[in-house]
């Protein structure tokens, strides 16, 4: 094989180079003068085939930047060392390891195949750095440089340009362990060598199995298999174990305690504790589904009973070792858990959580962080985990097409009064998912003899080796290399294709077909061995090793069988359905393999091509119900001290004391803004998100509850919320559990739900449970959670545990300390939502004292306990007082709020949690961009000591704050009194308090707090906003272009001045009503081809928008067009190019998609003909917009390639998820007719949305001919290049392009995710009144109605 090199510069941006140089200086004291970079594309093709001129031209177009041909070179590097100073210059090249094909190569070769370059079978991209240093770099310094620029698991140093991908590695032979001869000693040896995590009971059990029962030696493959399948991670020994608590045998296991909540409150439950997700009854739902799953076809309306599903899990150990990869595969694994429920289910949205140790942000002092703490070398530091784990999870969800709609994060590291250091060195990476399923597919069917075992998804790689057993160990107990080997690597685009075939099978039944899936399980811990045994249990199967698709020819049998390579499911189907599944998979371009058959002999047998059987295990022996293990749990007396304020704060005035406390608390990660997390993750894809993290005119990240819709046609849906209060556990595990459940419910209660009894929960436990004093705390928490839930009438129906939450860290004296993470319980609720438009959000909405009242619901009954609060944490304390427990009051409050929500008597509402009452009020004020005047009663004679005021304002007892209209005050108070909810009137929204004497002449709203008429706090909103945003801002500086981060902060502070100020939306037209007979009219309706490519994810919402406007939408893949299964012929009046990440954005956004059209003559002719017809239109959104530019459809034909406008990487250097303001300009665009002059909000999500043209004359032409009809504008409706109003940094505010005849329109933002009013995160009253309410289509439906009007005009 021949490898040819192609070069493109630069590989990384200027700001990334600056960041790299800064990190080298800060972390290793290495001074670098300059760094130049380039990519090297290593392209492999057969020796006997030299690329001809046409093939090379195609490849160059794909690999190069179209407008920068000078920055691309064939065979010749751009990087040269000088002849005079080579001592201080070095070229460093890093790239993928040769032994496996990367995700990049898989996508790149798929693109090549679509572009008639199937001769190319591999393309690997390396990065080359020309480093000029102040002095010659030592070997150690080069290693330190390498640490910062590559992933040592998947990449390596290239000392010279590579000549071959062949490594010469031969797969390791199967080894047999001499258990028959040596007994237990042989197993002990392999246990240590392979990191299998066998304990004493395991060793005895498996020695007996092989020595006495099977009477043979196990292979290393079998040992590895058993080690993964029977680890704590997989078997949950602790939750299933016998517990001796303080010397007394508990009559229930932890699982029995947890499951008893469901036994007591089974209402609405369909699947619980028995599948990959849990499920509850949902609603009968109208859906829009393609008629066929194996060929292009029209979308048709259908109905199904649609239960709601939820799953939640953690990926803590892998995230601690490799944060980005651990979090992305945690997300991917949870996604597969979601769709592998029953006989296949439907993914909708995700939830996330991150808990890390002290951040230690360079240059940003947080006074409670201990700078003397040391961290282990084999794990990432907390700051890196916080940033990179969230990057990994976000990136995977963005590419997959799953929105993240709610979450949490916290940082903790402290020394307790007993001298023990507690910190999340081993982090929490939490991932939850909510979705739906077809009720007909609730139960997996049992295997039958002759059924076919299928592996669907990505090929086998040497990644994720031993993740199950490694996750079951304390961090530091395993060899570092084994730790790193246990981390997986994700491929979101492959995961999305896998999800599509599961969805295709699920949806095949809607229009009269048959779901071929008998059973489905996702591949996770234990790899193929675990999932294949699981799916054929108890009948057994013969599995053929050589049928399992491998991406690495050097893999051994053990690695193919045991590695957790991602994006893989095991399916069980009947033999007669093989052809159907194959057709579905070919259409979606997903690899599948029919790897074996169910036998009925009860044995899982793995057979090599040579006839060897490295696995030959009787399932009843290895998957049997094992004898429970026994755990001894004893309470350890807590050493607690009451919370005290520093003396210097006690002697000053109350305001000084309060200001210092608040300044600290607002900078705590769990309390302050989470903007650094939410702006980089998609929160609207699918078009089914009714409520996500951001609210109010400034799109502020303050949420109670997340809500999704059942579909596009009605108002039913599902709500989910999260509760977690781990720091309270240092005082009392029971209090922690009570507050966790309470927080989950006081977050949930703002959505309109069917019934409290319908609420079901996932319980996730992250604890160092097997260490002294910890298991009993978990036990106490479980008992309290049980009691509270039973009394409330809710229940747990699923969850996961991670019980090795500790890590070894070095001490200054050279010894090690074992650092336990705080014990954590995360409760995720989910419940049917009867009206998604009624959800109450925290942002204040009323205008003045005259029309507003603020109510305070204190479920702590004025006790104001502060133990384990944010306040105690920021003074390096814990406290000793427990919160007030009152479950009946919690239940009554929930019921009262539900009644008020359904009667629409609350304008804004928010729970009390981290940071206390003052934080609740601040978040309501900032999110509404409105002032507040609060006057709390002084019930504790606060003149004597500021501590009582501090406790009043910072206590984290359960509670809530409501904003209501003054005209509704009496009816609201009556309802609250009816439910015996203690309520106080504490103030008013105050948008006109700028006349207050204390404002120093400012025109800003003020946030004012008094206690007993005594002024405690008086601050301008912009100053308050700066404090609340500060830590998020510091984190943002480390993950995006600092210039743009600073711009956002500057603009935010300009905007956060009160009076409800925000975008000035203006709608200049009325929209036509939606027909009630869309389904009946479909056959006569104009036809639009909704075209998607591999990796697209915006097709369903696009089809729905066109359907609502009266079109018959067709589901058309590029595979359909390339295979000639459908023509873009006269029947189609429109084409819609959808959003997403075609080919995972490999070779630049939409480049591969454009190439598959451009370089296929037959398809290219069809598109040219369609474009040339005068009776057609096209609409490209996001990825589709990028495609239309690359095809030259906009702004007009005939532009030279190097001058053709493009949409390139955002100037901020990252994916941007924003709710932006746009103005619709006068233009030829037919689809925007009548909308001119309107200023509207719209979802915008992209990583490459910056308009770019090298030719200023073309830019001038676009402006002169009004060919950019949608432009980014600021709050005043003025065209802007200012970030984040303009999220991509695009010149002239260009957010769109259209053709000169107006028939072809390309838009970067997402009107198809904004065409229904409930999809808008913020809709001001003037727009709401214009469209007729949140249950109506939004102003953006006009685009699609205009397309229909154009088609109608042709007749």
From Swiss-Prot:
Its EC number is 6.3.5.3. CDD domains: GATase1_FGAR_AT, PurL_repeat1, PurL_repeat2. Keywords: ATP-binding, Cytoplasm, Glutamine amidotransferase, Ligase, Magnesium, Metal-binding, Nucleotide-binding, Purine biosynthesis. It is found in: Cytoplasm. ATP binds at residues 326-337, 406-408, 913. The keyword Nuclease does not apply. It catalyses: N(2)-formyl-N(1)-(5-phospho-beta-D-ribosyl)glycinamide + L-glutamine + ATP + H2O = 2-formamido-N(1)-(5-O-phospho-beta-D-ribosyl)acetamidine + L-glutamate + ADP + phosphate + H(+). GO terms for cellular component: cytoplasm. SMART domains: GATase_5 (SM01211). Mg(2+) binds at residues 743, 747, 911. One of its GO terms (biological process) is 'de novo' IMP biosynthetic process. Gene3D superfamilies: 3.40.50.880, Phosphoribosylformylglycinamidine synthase, linker domain (1.10.8.750), PurM-like C-terminal domain (3.90.650.10), PurM-like, N-terminal domain (3.30.1330.10). Phosphoribosylformylglycinamidine synthase involved in the purines biosynthetic pathway. Catalyzes the ATP-dependent conversion of formylglycinamide ribonucleotide (FGAR) and glutamine to yield formylglycinamidine ribonucleotide (FGAM) and glutamate. In the N-terminal section; belongs to the FGAMS family. This is Phosphoribosylformylglycinamidine synthase. It comes from Dictyostelium discoideum. The lineage of its organism: Eukaryota, Amoebozoa, Evosea, Eumycetozoa, Dictyostelia.
């Amino acid at each position: 094989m021949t490898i040819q090199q192609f070069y493109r510069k630069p590989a990384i941006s200027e700001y990334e180079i600056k960041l790299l140089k800064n990190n080298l200086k800060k972390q290793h004291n290495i001074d670098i003068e300059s760094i130049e970079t380039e990519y090297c594309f290593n392209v492999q093709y057969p020796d006997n085939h030299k690329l001809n001129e046409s093939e090379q031209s195609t490849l160059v177009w794909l690999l190069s930047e179209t407008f920068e041909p000078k920055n691309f070179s064939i065979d010749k590097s751009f990087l040269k060392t000088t002849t005079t100073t080579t001592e201080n210059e070095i070229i460093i090249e890093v790239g993928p390891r040769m032994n496996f094909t990367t995700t990049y190569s898989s996508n790149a070769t798929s693109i090549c195949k679509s572009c008639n370059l199937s001769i190319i079978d591999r393309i690997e991209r390396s990065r080359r750095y020309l480093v000029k240093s102040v002095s010659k770099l030592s070997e150690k310094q080069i290693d330190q440089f390498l640490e910062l620029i590559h992933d040592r698991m998947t990449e390596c140093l290239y000392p010279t340009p590579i000549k071959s991908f062949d490594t010469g590695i031969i797969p390791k032979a199967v080894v047999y362990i001499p258990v028959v001869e040596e007994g237990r000693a042989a197993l002990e040896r392999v246990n240590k060598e392979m990191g299998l995590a066998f304990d004493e009971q395991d060793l005895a059990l498996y020695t007996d199995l092989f020595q006495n029962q099977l009477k043979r030696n196990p292979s290393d493959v079998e040992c590895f298999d058993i080690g993964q399948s029977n680890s704590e991670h997989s078997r949950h020994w602790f939750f299933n174990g016998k517990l001796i608590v303080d010397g007394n045998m508990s009559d229930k296991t932890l699982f029995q305690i947890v499951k008893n909540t469901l036994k007591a409150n089974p209402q609405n439950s369909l699947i619980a504790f028995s599948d990959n997700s849990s499920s509850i009854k949902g609603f009968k739902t109208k859906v829009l589904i393609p008629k066929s799953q194996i060929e292009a076809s029209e979308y048709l309306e259908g109905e199904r009973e649609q239960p709601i599903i939820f799953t939640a899990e953690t990926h803590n150990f892998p995230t601690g070792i490799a944060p980005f990869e651990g979090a992305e595969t945690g997300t991917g694994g949870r996604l597969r858990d979601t769709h592998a429920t029953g006989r296949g289910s439907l993914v909708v949205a995700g939830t996330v959580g991150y808990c890390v140790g002290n951040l230690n942000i360079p240059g940003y002092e947080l006074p409670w962080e201990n700078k003397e703490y040391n961290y282990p070398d084999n794990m990432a530091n907390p700051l890196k985990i916080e940033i990179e784990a969230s990057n990994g999870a976000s990136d995977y969800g963005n590419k997959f097409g799953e929105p993240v709609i709610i979450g949490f994060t916290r940082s903790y590291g402290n020394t307790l009064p007993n001298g023990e250091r507690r910190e999340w060195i081993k982090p929490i990476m939490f991932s939850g998912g909510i979705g739906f399923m077809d009720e007909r597919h609730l139960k997996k069917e049992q295997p039958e003899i002759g059924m076919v075992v299928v592996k669907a998804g990505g090929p086998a790689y040497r990644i994720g080796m031993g993740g199950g057993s490694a996750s079951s160990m304390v961090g530091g107990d395993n060899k570092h290399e084994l730790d790193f080997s246990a981390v997986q690597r994700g491929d979101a685009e492959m995961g999305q294709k896998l999800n599509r075939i599961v969805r295709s099978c699920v949806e095949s039944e809607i229009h009269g077909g048959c779901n071929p899936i008998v059973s489905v399980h996702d591949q996770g811990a234990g790899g193929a061995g675990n999932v294949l045994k699981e799916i054929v249990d108890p009948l057994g199967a013969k599995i053929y090793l050589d049928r399992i698709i491998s991406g690495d020819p050097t893999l051994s049998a053990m690695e193919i069988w045991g590695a957790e390579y991602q994006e893989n499911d095991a399916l069980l189907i009947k033999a007669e359905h093989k052809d159907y599944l194959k057709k579905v998979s070919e259409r979606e371009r997903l690899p599948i393999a029919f790897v074996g058959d169910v036998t009925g002999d009860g044995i899982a047998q793995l057979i090599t091509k040579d006839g060897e059987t490295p696995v030959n295990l009787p399932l009843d022996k290895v998957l049997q119900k094992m004898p429970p293990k026994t755990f001894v749990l004893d309470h350890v007396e807590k050493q607690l001290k009451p919370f005290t304020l520093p003396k210097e704060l006690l002697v000053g005035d109350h305001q000084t004391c309060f200001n210092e406390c608040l300044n600290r608390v607002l900078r705590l990660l769990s309390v302050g803004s989470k903007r650094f997390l939410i702006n980089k993750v998609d929160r609207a894809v699918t078009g089914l998100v009714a409520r996500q993290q951001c609210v109010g005119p400034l799109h502020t990240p303050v949420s109670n509850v997340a809500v999704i819709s059942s579909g596009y046609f009605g108002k039913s849906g599902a709500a989910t919320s999260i509760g977690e209060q781990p720091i309270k556990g240092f005082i009392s595990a029971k209090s922690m559990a009570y507050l966790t459940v309470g927080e989950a419910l006081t977050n949930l209660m703002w959505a309109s739900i069917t019934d409290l009894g319908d609420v079901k929960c996932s319980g996730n436990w992250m604890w160092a449970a097997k260490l002294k004093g910890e298991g009993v705390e978990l036990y106490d928490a479980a008992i309290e959670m049980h009691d509270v839930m039973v009394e409330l009438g809710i229940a747990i129906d699923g969850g996961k545990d991670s019980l090795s939450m500790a890590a070894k860290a070095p001490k200054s004296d050279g010894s090690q300390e074992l650092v336990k993470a705080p014990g954590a319980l995360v409760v995720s609720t989910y419940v049917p939502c009867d009206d998604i438009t009624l959800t109450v959000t925290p942002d204040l909405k009323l205008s003045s004292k005259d029309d507003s009242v603020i109510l305070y619901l204190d479920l702590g009954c004025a006790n104001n306990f502060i133990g384990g609060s944010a306040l105690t944490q920021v003074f390096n304390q814990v406290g000793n007082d427990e919160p007030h427990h009152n479950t009946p009051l919690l239940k009554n409050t929930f019921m009262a709020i539900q009644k008020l929500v359904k009667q629409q008597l609350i304008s804004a509402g928010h729970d009390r949690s981290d940071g206390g009452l003052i934080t609740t009020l601040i978040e309501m004020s900032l999110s509404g961009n409105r002032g507040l005047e609060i006057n709390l009663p002084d019930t504790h004679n606060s003149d004597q000591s500021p501590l009582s005021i501090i406790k009043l304002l910072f206590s984290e007892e359960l509670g809530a704050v409501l904003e209501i209209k003054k005209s509704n005050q009496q009816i609201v108070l009556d309802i609250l009194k009816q439910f015996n909810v203690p309520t106080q009137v504490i103030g008013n929204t105050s948008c006109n308090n700028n006349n207050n004497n204390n404002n120093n002449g400012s025109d800003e709203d003020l946030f004012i707090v008094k206690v007993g008429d005594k002024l405690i706090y008086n601050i301008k909103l912009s100053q308050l906003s700066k404090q609340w945003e500060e830590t998020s801002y510091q984190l943002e500086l480390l993950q995006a272009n600092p210039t743009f981060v600073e711009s956002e902060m500057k603009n935010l502070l300009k905007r956060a001045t009160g009076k409800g100020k925000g975008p000035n939306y203006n709608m200049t037209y009325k929209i036509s009503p939606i027909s009630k007979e869309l389904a009946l009219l479909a056959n006569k309706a104009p036809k639009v081809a909704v075209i998607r490519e591999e990796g697209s994810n915006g097709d369903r919402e696009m089809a729905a928008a066109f359907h609502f406007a009266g079109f018959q939408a067709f589901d058309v893949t590029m595979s359909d067009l390339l295979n000639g299964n459908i023509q873009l012929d006269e029947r189609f009046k429109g084409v819609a190019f959808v959003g997403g990440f075609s080919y995972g954005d490999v070779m630049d956004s939409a480049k591969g998609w454009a190439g598959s059209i451009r370089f296929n003559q037959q398809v290219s002719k069809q598109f040219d003909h369609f474009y040339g017809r005068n009776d057609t239109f096209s609409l490209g959104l996001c990825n589709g917009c990028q495609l239309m530019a690359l095809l030259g459809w906009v702004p007009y034909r005939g532009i030279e390639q190097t001058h053709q406008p493009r949409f390139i990487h955002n100037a901020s250097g990252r994916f941007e998820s924003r709710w932006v303001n746009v103005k619709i300009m006068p233009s030829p665009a037919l689809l925007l007719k009548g909308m001119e002059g309107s200023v509207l909000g719209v979802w915008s999500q992209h990583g490459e949305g910056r308009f770019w043209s090298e030719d200023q004359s073309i830019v001038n032409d676009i402006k002169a001919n009004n060919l950019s009809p949608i432009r980014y504008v600021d709050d005043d409706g003025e065209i802007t290049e200012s970030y984040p109003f303009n999220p991509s940094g695009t010149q002239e505010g260009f957010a769109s392009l259209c053709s000169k005849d107006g028939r072809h329109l390309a838009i970067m933002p997402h009107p198809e995710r904004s065409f229904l009013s409930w999809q808008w995160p913020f809709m001001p009253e003037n727009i709401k009144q214009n469209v007729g309410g949140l249950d109506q289509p939004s102003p953006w439906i006009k685009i699609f109605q205009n397309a229909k009007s154009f088609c109608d005009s042709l007749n």
